[in-house]
């Protein structure tokens, strides 16, 4: 439960022990407490001088939400500014309640304003029933990062440096440290991260790059855009990632690189892939768009190959408020090439050493990602906990005879998606879940080797049986860090009803 504490309640709780139980609940982690930044001044004015030293300790366990200019404008429509502002903030941020000593002061509250005793009863009482679960709600945790993000945006707006600049450099330094690499180069999208990496590796006309047919289009599309030919190798039936033994069969004198995909948040088996690359003198470009923070034998995704490519698409575990991406590397030579290529191949400006492109990351997106990066580990652990809850619930409900759970073969899996196999009944299950207002998605319904645009490659249905089987059987369930256990229980109960009719 997330609650906004009105200043009248806080003044009472800090002036006496009466009603302080809600603060104790917040301290104990039984609910998430918020205070409006405008409330701090009201507390300072409303408390006795000797009580003001109690304000600062509040901020060690309460979070601050800052009203936007629009929030303030809405609240000024009338004579009850403070009460209207509290309701406006609660509705825009999705808080469950405003805690006040005088709920009757709030007009049109629609039951949103509660006393301390009512909050206590609600937390101690039965959990509200669930009747809808979104696959992903990008805005659900916005209030959690609001202050940090708005500070970054304000800094950028005031400096007027919107393309590259210090914000991008700061993000690059933080990402390289996080991914355990020497360098990181911010670019315009995850797709462009793949393309610029191929260009930096000198891959082009007449070259072949081996990758998976079971992935997002950009993986193979970037290879074609670089002028090279994608060569597909089938996947492991458990991890959905490319297998080294299939890669080896595809290597020819024209092969210049391997592009393994760390699909759904789990790293591919990189040790044998890197051994093949060393044996045949091949570049390895990791498509880690879905796997920031994932690990393989204590090494982070993005540090395993020659370059690692990440996406900051808003739906990713670490997403911007628009498009963005980054390339990681520990190679001095590749780093210099990447920096030049992202600005049309120029060094210095207007003097072009090569044909590059406009692959620049803008400072606003860099600031947003930098602000969110400090939350990533906590969000990742929550996703991992959610995956454990799913596994336990599905096993307890005797559903593993009908569906295959996503195993964590290489710790640690970051669960960008929680993907189950539902066999021949996948499409029926998806329809049933949608009818019960449960968001779910098929990633990916048609493997790349049978996509119309790749017809000239000469592949046909049946060439990659594991990829085709995965495309026909897999289904992604809601797994974001915002999802609650009661929502997961609702989802599993509906899956149980689908398979067992109970």
Task: Kindly give the residue locations of the regions a language model identified.
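Short, well-structured N-terminal submotif of metal-dependent ribonuclease cores
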Residues: 1-35, 45-54
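Active-site neighborhoods of divalent-metal-dependent phosphate/nucleic-acid chemistry enzymes
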Residues: 64-104
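Acidic, PIN/NYN-like endoribonuclease modules and their adjacent C-terminal/linker elements
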Residues: 87, 91-135
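N-terminal "arm"/small-domain region of PLP-dependent enzymes with the aminotransferase-like
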Residues: 124-161, 478
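PLP-dependent aminotransferase class I/II
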Residues: 151, 168-173, 181-182, 245, ...
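Phosphate-binding glycine-rich loop
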Residues: 161-208, 222-225, 232-234, 299
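PLP-dependent aminotransferase-like
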Residues: 199-288, 295
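Conserved active-site segment immediately N-terminal to the catalytic lysine
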Residues: 286-321, 348-353
